[in-house]
Swiss-Prot record:
Protein name listed in UniProt: 23S rRNA (uracil(747)-C(5))-methyltransferase RlmC
GO biological process per UniProt: rRNA base methylation
The gene coding this protein: rlmC
UniProtKB keywords: 4Fe-4S, Iron, Iron-sulfur, Metal-binding, Methyltransferase, rRNA processing, S-adenosyl-L-methionine, Transferase
Function: Catalyzes the formation of 5-methyl-uridine at position 747 (m5U747) in 23S rRNA.
Organism: Salmonella agona (strain SL483)
Enzyme Commission number(s): 2.1.1.189
């Protein structure tokens, strides 16, 4: 992949960009083998990749410059702004949105936040696109609610220019720190969730719910989990750290009892909406801490699927799973190092199957799916 920003030394986010995709995949596979050394693996499945460029469904843009000439991108190490509108990871459909937003910011009087001076209102623009229908969600991250009236007044012009904007919000982030978003979300449209669909499974994206940024590879990840679960005798399943329910919704059958647990209420609202659309009445999603939920249960499911953040599931949950001893565990991880540490805390399980998913091309990161079977 060619990138003018990388060639000019202005952006180093894609640190592996000079390597071919095959070289990157080989290096990631070697890293995974190294991390799982000493843990016998019955089957290494072929790694799964995706597009080399234009694959991201989300842009996170720092807004800098002036209200008349805003700049979208990031701040360089030396503090100077870098325009990322031409980033080759973004789909072509993002360009007209960025183009329309620049005059809109002037119309709405949204002064870009100046980090050095601690002045201004508009900190970030967060844009997400659905692969299902091309609909988009736009979030204005503001320092305060001061400009909300002006923002609302100017919105009809923006929506006329960009009818693909289905969900628009203002997120209030008052803290002078490099924090992407605050707790307060103010909806500026009637529609509050973006419709997505992977493998004929309806999914929903809300402003403060996590969603994978590489939909092509994510859909293959979910489909693989569904295939694996379909080969197992599973009637009762837990989906821990379930997010918007991608794994559970793919794996569930009308006969299966499934409980999905996620600490973010916004994500659980998405999962419940999807389950209702599918007519799956034995699926139950709850906004709880996954470890606290699991350790409070007296029953043992046939399978526990975990998809934790980078820190992994941790020793307390590992210890409880080892004691509870479900017949199967499926571990989906964006950090194979912590996954390997967790698996070593599950001595009564063998690794039946491992598959790498290249969710983050041009970086050292990847997703991995692992099936563990009780000895």
């Amino acid at each position: 992949m060619q990138c003018a920003l990388y060639d000019a030394g202005r952006c180093r986010s894609c640190q592996w960009i000079t390597q071919s995709v095959n070289e990157q995949l080989s290096a990631k596979t070697a890293d995974l083998h190294r991390l799982l050394a000493g843990l016998p693996v019955e089957q290494w499945c072929a790694p799964t990749g995706g597009p080399e460029q234009r694959f991201r469904n989300k842009a996170k843009m720092v807004v800098s410059g002036s209200v008349e000439k805003p700049l979208f991108g990031m701040l360089h190490r030396d503090g100077t702004p870098v325009d990322l509108c031409g980033c080759p990871l973004y789909p072509a459909s993002f360009a007209p949105v960025f183009s329309a937003l620049k005059p809109f910011i002037a119309r709405a009087g949204l002064t870009p936040y100046n980090v050095a001076r601690k002045r201004g209102e508009l900190k970030y623009l967060l844009l997400t696109e659905s692969q299902f229908d091309g609909g988009m969600m736009l979030r204005f991250v503001l320092r305060s609610e001061t400009k909300l009236t002006q923002l609302r007044a100017a919105l009809p012009w923006l929506r006329a220019q960009l009818p693909q904007l289905k969900v628009i919000t203002a997120n209030i982030q008052p803290v002078h720190m490099a924090i992407m978003e605050g707790e307060t979300e103010i909806y500026l449209t009637d529609q509050q969730a973006l419709a997505e669909r992977f493998n004929d499974v309806p999914l929903w994206i809300r402003p403060q719910s996590f969603f994978q940024t590489n939909p092509t590879v994510a859909s293959r990840l979910y489909a693989t989990a569904r295939d694996w679960v379909g080969q197992l005798p599973v009637r009762h399943m837990w989906d821990l750290f379930c997010g918007v329910g991608g794994f559970g919704l793919h794996c569930a059958t009308p006969q299966m009892q499934l409980t999905g647990i996620e600490i973010a209420p916004e994500a659980i609202a998405c999962a419940k909406q999807s389950a209702a659309e599918l007519g799956l009445t034995r699926l139950h999603f709850q906004a709880l801490d996954s470890t606290q939920f699991a350790t409070a249960q007296g029953e043992t499911p046939d399978l526990v699927l975990v998809n934790p953040p980078r820190r992994g599931i941790g020793k307390p949950l590992c210890d409880y799973l080892a004691q509870m001893a479900p017949r199967f565990i499926i571990y989906s991880s964006c950090n194979a190092q912590t996954m390997a540490q967790d698996i070593r805390h599950l001595p009564n399980y063998r690794i039946q199957r491992v598959q790498l998913f290249d969710m983050f091309p041009h970086t050292a990161h990847y997703e991995v799916l692992t099936l563990l079977c009780r000895l």
